[in-house]
Amino acid sequence: MINDVVILVGGSGTRLGSITKYTPKPLLKINNISFLDQLICKLIKYKFKKIYLMCSYKKDKFFKKYHKIFIHRTKIICIDEGKAMGTGGALFKIRNKIKNNF
């Protein structure tokens, strides 16, 4: 069974232009609920133990809202990517925390 989920939320959303100037793309709202909240709600139904958010751009917003909170026994952990290095860099940084293949 897969216990951990990794969500890459570090992109700066440059293709969205001014829309993401103050709000990171995953925190943009669709029907008054952020995309990330919608995704987390769907993942919680599958009873994962941990959700890792790989943060870079405007990381303080993710840490403030999500870091080390529990939702129905699922722990959300924010990881600071440091300098954004793309998908490979984010996954390389978290490689020692993930117990399962994914």
Residues of each region from the PLM?
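Active-site glycine-centered loops adjacent to acidic/histidine catalytic or metal-binding residues
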Residues: 11
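Conserved catalytic-core motifs of eukaryotic protein kinase domains, centered on the activation segment
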Residues: 18-21
